[in-house]
Amino acid sequence: MNTADSSLLADIREVNLSYLLLAQRMLRDDYAASMFRLGFSNEVADILMRLSPAQLVKLAGSSSLLCRFRFDDYSLLSALTQDVLGGALQQAHATILLAKQPVEQLA
């Protein structure tokens, strides 16, 4: 493995760990709102809440990103890029579009 590949893998692990730690913190602070914001089902949120720091580090060590870019819908992405009413309308529209997306579960 060359230096660029190992650097990329290290960056992926760092993003994964940051994401998992943030998700746990969000769920502890406001479980229901965080499930909505993260797009988690009850089962996934419960599992994530129970993971120990060692388990988080092990899970973060994956060579794949654990978080998913949810802006794969043109209408959602365009809603976020239009400045209407100082951004309030676009934020509401984006929230509605995100809420319509199905909750994905860890396989």
UniProtKB/Swiss-Prot annotation:
Which compartments is it annotated to reside in?
A: Cytoplasm
On whether Flavoprotein is a keyword of this UniProt record, the answer is no
Pfam families, from UniProt?
FlhD
Q: What is its main location?
A: cytoplasm
Task: Tell me a GO cellular component.
Answer: cytoplasm
What GO molecular-function term can you cite, just one?
DNA binding
List, alphabetically, the SUPFAM superfamilies matched: Flagellar transcriptional activator FlhD
Q: Which InterPro entries match?
A: Flagellar_FlhD (IPR023559), FlhD_sf (IPR036194)
Provide the GO biological process annotations.
bacterial-type flagellum assembly; positive regulation of DNA-templated transcription; regulation of bacterial-type flagellum assembly
Keyword set for this entry?
Activator, Bacterial flagellum biogenesis, Cytoplasm, Disulfide bond, DNA-binding, Transcription, Transcription regulation
- Which NCBIfam families has this protein been placed in? PRK02909.1-1
Q: What role does this protein play?
A: Functions in complex with FlhC as a master transcriptional regulator that regulates transcription of several flagellar and non-flagellar operons by binding to their promoter region. Activates expression of class 2 flagellar genes, including fliA, which is a flagellum-specific sigma factor that turns on the class 3 genes. Also regulates genes whose products function in a variety of physiological pathways.
Similarity comment: Belongs to the FlhD family.
Its domain description in UniProt is: The C-terminal region contains a putative helix-turn-helix (HTH) motif, suggesting that this region may bind DNA.
Q: How does it assemble?
A: Homodimer; disulfide-linked. Forms a heterohexamer composed of two FlhC and four FlhD subunits. Each FlhC binds a FlhD dimer, forming a heterotrimer, and a hexamer assembles by dimerization of two heterotrimers.
> Can you name this protein?
Flagellar transcriptional regulator FlhD
User: From which organism does this entry originate?
Assistant: Bordetella petrii (strain ATCC BAA-461 / DSM 12804 / CCUG 43448)
